Regions:
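Short S/T/G/P-rich N-terminal loop/turn motif that feeds into the first structured element of a domain
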Residues: 1-53, 60-70, 93-97
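C-terminal structural segments of small proteins and small subunits
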Residues: 65-90
Length: 97
């Protein structure tokens, strides 16, 4: 069984309020064993367009990645995030070991 990942590109519209999303999302990340591989950091756009922040979150498997996204805990956080940021958000399978 391969791991699964959230790949999220973020443009924050309200830097002052965005931390509300981060705080609200924490319980879902803990509950589902999320592991941050990339969280912000310096980057260079080599092709195409970019957003100001990039996040990669690893989950045990595809079912867990979707369960976290669909959980009441994360959906509450998502509502907050949508007020303060624009995102491109995908869930993708990793390469099998």
């Amino acid at each position: 069984m391969s791991k699964a990942y959230w790949i999220v590109r973020v443009s924050v519209r309200d830097e002052q309020r965005y931390p509300e999303y981060l705080a609200a999302a924490g319980p879902a990340f803990q509950k589902f064993g999320a592991r941050f591989i990339v969280r912000g950091g310096k980057f260079e756009t080599m092709e195409g367009s970019a957003r100001e922040r990039n996040v990669v979150v690893e989950f045990q498997d595809r079912a867990t990645a979707f369960a976290c996204y669909r959980s009441p805990e994360y959906q509450s956080a998502r509502t907050i995030r949508q007020k303060y940021a624009d995102t491109d958000f995908i869930i993708i399978d990793g390469v099998a070991d």
